[in-house]
């Protein structure tokens, strides 16, 4: 498999550190609010990576963290009067619900920052002993970036514009130095005991320490195979992670670095701090999770995606075609997927998750299958292979797994379904009584409601247009 390494800025052949086992770490959410479509995009992108690696025969260990202590969480506590545990457990559960709705597989390891303070304190102590960190007069502990000769070689973003994102502090030795431990500020703060005094960890140390504790190899030049996350995390977060690990553990953090593009609205990056978030939960009230997944999946993971309803509906129509084919082979048992088709999909995804080629291959399969069924409606062996191919698509991309008829009823309330069924029953009675004028009138009434009907040997079927 070939992937694009964000640090090297080139395509690399994926060579596991050990055997055919790939260890992947993806930065998870800071749980102070609901997740937005930017979080969904990242989760879906690397879920596709995981599914592809598994399909290619690699064993994977996948880890995603929860940042459950942070300035934003403390601010939320002070605003709401709720405890740290109340806020973080609530938003972790909501995040997991969102991921389930989007078809994102649970990570093998899901550590929380507050449950791994021992690992963070241990890493900070190592950095202090090596004189790669220092304590300021007010008790904060900072990483000394001047002690890492390779600092900025990951992101290549130590220019003036990038450095302007870093909060200035007169107690720091160097402008790029970053907090490892923040001294307790008193009332309203969240504090933990440590050898350095009461306080809490900085954001960057959390990921490095949890990787070192739960996922890392300690006998290889790199701790893990792939570190992944959103492009906005490359600097300073991932740069700082890499520096800490290098200095504390005498290892590089990851052999490969992968970053997904932004989700934008009118060209502006989606983030909660900008106030233009489209929360996943809000989107799920309007669109089914599978449709959202397919839409977010349909643009290559490294490209920015400008969210708009027109593209989403076009994406839905593309997914509709798969389900229409699935309806044509409803009730047929699968045989085995076509080898040439499987190879074509895996070859495309093996090229840095080339989703465009992957979906083109699926479109071609759907078109050919429909044409063959039109000409050979009784070809049972072919129908079985169609079902097998669709099942393989479902396993690989996480789409196409719903009941074909239920899919076309998505977004219809139970009350609306009851009305539709009553009209269809009324139409069936009218046809039996040869009242074709009434039957046609009911068909038009249903069409005006956005419902198309099809008369089949199994009865009248309907779907949302």
UniProtKB/Swiss-Prot annotation:
Q: Where does Zn(2+) bind?
A: 27, 207, 237, 241
Specify which residues bind ATP according to the UniProt entry for this protein.
Answer: 272
What EC number(s) is this enzyme filed under? 6.1.1.16
One GO term (biological process): cysteinyl-tRNA aminoacylation
Transmembrane stretches in the record are none
Needed cofactors, names only, are: Zn(2+)
Q: Which Gene3D superfamilies does this entry report, sorted A to Z? A: Cysteine-tRNA ligase, C-terminal anti-codon recognition domain, HUPs
Keyword flag Nucleus = no
Sorted alphabetically, which InterPro entries does this protein's record hold?
Answer: Cys-tRNA-ligase, Cys-tRNA/MSH_ligase, Rossmann-like_a/b/a_fold, tRNA-synt_1_cat_dom, tRNAsynth_Ia_anticodon-bd
> What keywords were assigned to this record?
Aminoacyl-tRNA synthetase, ATP-binding, Cytoplasm, Ligase, Metal-binding, Nucleotide-binding, Protein biosynthesis, Zinc
The residue numbers the entry assigns to motif 'HIGH' region are 29-39
Which reaction(s) does the protein catalyse, per the Swiss-Prot or TrEMBL entry?
tRNA(Cys) + L-cysteine + ATP = L-cysteinyl-tRNA(Cys) + AMP + diphosphate
Task: Return the motif ranges for 'KMSKS' region.
Answer: 269-273
Cell compartment(s), UniProt:
Cytoplasm
Q: How is the cofactor bound?
A: Binds 1 zinc ion per subunit.
What is one term from the GO cellular component aspect held by the record? cytosol
Q: What NCBIfam families does this protein's entry cite? A: cysS
> How does this polypeptide assemble, per the annotation?
Monomer.
The name this protein carries in UniProt is Cysteine--tRNA ligase
Its gene name is cysS
